[in-house]
């Protein structure tokens, strides 16, 4: 027996967490000084979308949002309870190169295993990603568990997936990246005036990398579709993910265009998680899929790659 755990940045809708028996540890944000739990286990998809609209509207209106790590104490209490119940643990983290959450979990896991002598295991998987790039790994692991694979078989197999699970996204307004200090306010202002839309992706090392640029919202959405369709492998056996920061109509458009070109097993369409979403801002939209690697080709349609940058979320 083993438990699959994610943090709420994995962006798995509540109903799917129940279906796949995935435990979620929630981030807690401060919004204008008031605590907000990022994941609520009993929300319907409609309620999740409504909560997302409320949250991203608050950001549009200038709310002060502060994010933080899940403490090693919370990890330790959670891990200890499961290990003492004689179960192994498989935990999927945000990329450790954009968050310190992996290290918090590592400290907790070491402390629990030092105290426990029942032979149970804790394995941590660095997703090298965020949002559904993290969540899809947990879902695939759950499917393997359901098929009867052992803990080590699942962990050994799923550890090969992050190198092929691509995350590609765009932002709605450059000012939110400027607020992180990784883009000047002047550059953001000019970029917005010219309707320059960047495309970013997760690198093979789990950093956020600026990849391409487009002119206009529809063009950048089409380019996300191109990149997915040109690089996905075995789509008929894949679940693809679409996450949006209160850009529901755009997410439906992207899914419609993808389905016109390829057949996929399933699509998860969800509101972008509130922790990482606060750093990229409203109208951000991401797609997630398995490719042969994370060195994306295709797409482009003449748009040259840009130099890379990376930033820590927390």
Annotate each predicted stretch with a short phrase.
Residues 297-302, 311:
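Intrinsically disordered, glycine-rich low-complexity segments
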Residues 3-74:
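N-terminal glycine-rich anion-binding loop in soluble enzyme alpha/beta folds
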Residues 306-314:
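Hydrophobic alpha-helical signal peptides and transmembrane signal-/tail-anchor segments
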Residues 60-96, 103-107, 155, 162:
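Glycine-rich phosphate- or other oxyanion-binding loops that anchor nucleotides, phosphorylated ligands
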Residues 3, 9-17, 22-23, 28-36, ...:
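Mixed-charge interfacial surface used for oligomerization/domain docking
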Residues 1, 85-88, 263:
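Short loop/turn motifs at secondary-structure junctions
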Residues 93-95, 125-128:
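Short beta-strand->loop
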């Amino acid at each position: 027996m083993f438990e699959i755990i994610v943090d709420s940045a994995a962006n798995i809708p509540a109903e799917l967490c129940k279906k796949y028996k995935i435990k979620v540890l929630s981030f807690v944000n401060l919004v204008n000084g008031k605590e907000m739990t990022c994941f609520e286990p009993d929300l319907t998809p409609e309620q999740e979308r409504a909560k997302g609209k409320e949250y991203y509207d608050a950001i549009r209106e200038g709310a002060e949002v502060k994010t933080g790590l899940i403490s090693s104490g919370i990890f330790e209490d959670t891990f200890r309870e499961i290990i003492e119940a004689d179960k192994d643990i498989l935990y999927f983290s945000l990329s450790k190169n954009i968050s310190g959450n992996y290290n918090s979990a590592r400290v907790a896991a070491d402390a629990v295993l030092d105290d426990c002598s029942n032979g149970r295991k804790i394995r941590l998987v660095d997703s090298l990603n965020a949002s559904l790039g993290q969540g899809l790994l947990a879902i695939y692991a759950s499917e393997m568990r359901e098929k009867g694979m052992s803990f080590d078989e699942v962990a050994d197999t799923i550890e090969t997936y992050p190198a092929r699970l691509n995350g590609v996204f765009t932002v709605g307004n450059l000012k939110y990246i400027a607020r992180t200090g990784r883009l000047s306010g002047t550059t953001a202002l000019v970029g917005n005036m010219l309707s320059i839309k960047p495309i970013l992706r997760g690198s093979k090392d789990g950093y956020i990398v600026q990849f391409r640029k487009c002119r206009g919202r529809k063009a950048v959405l089409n380019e996300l579709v191109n990149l997915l369709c040109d690089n996905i492998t075995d789509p008929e056996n894949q679940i693809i993910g679409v996450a949006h920061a209160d850009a529901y109509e755009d997410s439906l458009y992207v899914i419609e265009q993808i389905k016109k070109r390829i057949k996929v097993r399933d699509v998860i369409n969800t509101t972008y998680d509130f922790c990482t979403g606060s750093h990229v801002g409203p109208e951000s939209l991401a797609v997630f899929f398995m490719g042969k690697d994370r060195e994306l080709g295709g797409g482009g349609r003449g748009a040259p790659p840009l130099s890379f940058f990376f930033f820590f979320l927390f």
